[in-house]
Amino acid sequence: LTARAVFVGGYRMGHALMAFQFDHFLEGIDVTYIVTNIAEKHYKGTLSKYGLDPNRFQYVNDQELIDAYPEILNWDQPGDYRGTWLRQQALKIASLDYFDYETILIQDPDTFAIQPYRCFDGLVPNFFVLPNVTHSNGYYWAIEKGLGIKRQTKDCFVSEFMPFLKQDWHTMRSLLEARHDRHFLDAIIDNCQRESGTNLIWFSEYEYLANYVMTQRSINTTEQKRFEVRKLADIENLNSQEYNCYVDACTRLEDSIQFEFTTNTVVDFDKIYNAIASQL
């Protein structure tokens, strides 16, 4: 079986409900877990409202993972203006240990496929990549310091999708703990570069994990052609012949898909959904 774990922070509830409408483009997924800090009642009271079967999903609260891996909290950095940005990455990495599936797909809900995508070809992971893209130097410094390997490709794996094999997780965890003599989560965060002047840690779980996999096996790649929405009015320019993923790239939350918790309602859901669906 192949599992999918979708990580939904509070401000991404509306994005998740929209992304789930397009799950038919994801091929080969047997079970979906929602990993979240949002109470389960909000999902069960909302999914059916938007045509989704609540029983199709399994729910894991963030606290369940934190209880199992308290080292997650070591990723919280005092004074970090990004809030729980690093913690979310620790949760994803911990989930690879927590879930008992041979193949798993990690996904952020602000990005979803709008063309068919199969994340595994048998036991060969199929990664979305951004060709010839480089991000913060800290991402690649952490790979070298933590794993003892160089960046394996000029392509970028920061796609919001991460297929991973359990057997690769086992070897990676063993490497980290043997190399650094500490829990795997501490081994990673303790070997990250701090930005001069700000003391911030820049880290990408997607780059870290995928570059490791490339040292273990051959992979398949699919170029991610991202339709990046910076305000909802941009949707009218969507063309599924040109793009294969919808990406919420709004810098201001008020320009993005919003969710009202008091009424369990996605603001302007029908308008936004119809605008996207009509272009596919």
Task: Show the residue positions of the predicted features.
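N-proximal low-complexity "stem/linker" segments adjacent to membrane-targeting elements
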Residues: 1-20
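Short beta-strand/loop segment that forms part of the nucleotide-sugar
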Residues: 29-40, 60-64
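A structural signal for short, well-ordered beta-strand segments and their strand-loop junctions
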Residues: 33-34, 59, 103-108, 112-114, ...
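Conserved catalytic core of nucleotide-sugar-dependent glycosyltransferases
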Residues: 117-199
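A glycosyltransferase accessory/donor-loop signature
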Residues: 183-280
